[in-house]
Amino acid sequence: MAKLAKQLIAKRFVSHLTEYDQYAIAQQQINHQLVDLLQANTDKTFQRALEIGCGTGNLTEKLLAKIPIEHLTLNDFNAIYYPTVLQKIKQKKPLVVVDFMQGDAEQLVFTRNFDLVSAASVVQWFDSPQQFLRNSAYALKPGGVVLFNSFSPLNLQEIRQLTGIGLNYPTRLQWQEWLAQDFEQCQLIEQPIKLTFDSPLAVLIHLKKTGVTAVSNKPWNRHQIKQFCMEYQAHFACEQGVYLTYTPILMLGIKKNG
């Protein structure tokens, strides 16, 4: 995968910090599904958990609402998220011990004492998704759980079809092979999410507010936006207006012993 400008990506996410949760409909559904996947595969209490790329804390809240966690380490590229996320945690789960590690998760070295490593809608931005699994295996105790999602190559295919813009996502088979190196009892579940919008312009606003357009470096002019909207309406109309498809792959693995 070509290296992404992570500083630019982080800056664009932060620029829509206060609006992200309002527009991140698919991402919130993914977070809910990840917690369900974890619940279906373990009933253990996690003494130490690590969440990579916590952002505004939506996965954090959902995990703590249903999963017993004693000590939670949060990570994100930007520390601006931490006070808000910490406040949410202390309001609902005041007994949970929380700390924060700022920085690029691909460059940080985590301690080797975690029971759970989680990451929601984050790994697709990494330069080396496979290395993420190696790092997770390093950070986990034997029997520890890695829980995360990526997206299939068909993700946001409507946008890619019209613009040629998109990330290079590993396939489910690639993920399965990578997981099998350090993890067992692996679960990989594809659950497409089709969102509907009133108009193509609403699609563009959704993408901008959720940071998905961070992969594109150049803003569009008025003519390009008008042309995109005409083509989108022609190709992807539905009864509710137009649609946009996310294709998440939910994944869970248990670290092998030895």
UniProtKB/Swiss-Prot annotation:
Q: What's the top EC group for this one?
A: transferase
Supply the Pfam families for this chain: Methyltransf_11
One GO biological process this protein is involved in is: biotin biosynthetic process
Give yes or no: UniProt keyword S-adenosyl-L-methionine.
Answer: yes
The EC code for this enzyme is: 2.1.1.197
Gene3D superfamilies annotated for this entry?
A: Vaccinia Virus protein VP39
The organism's superkingdom is given as Bacteria
Per the record, the similarity remark reads:
Belongs to the methyltransferase superfamily.
What is this protein's function?
Converts the free carboxyl group of a malonyl-thioester to its methyl ester by transfer of a methyl group from S-adenosyl-L-methionine (SAM). It allows to synthesize pimeloyl-ACP via the fatty acid synthetic pathway.
Under HAMAP family, the record lists: BioC
Q: What is the official name of this protein in its record?
A: Malonyl-[acyl-carrier protein] O-methyltransferase
Q: What is the source species?
A: Haemophilus ducreyi (strain 35000HP / ATCC 700724)
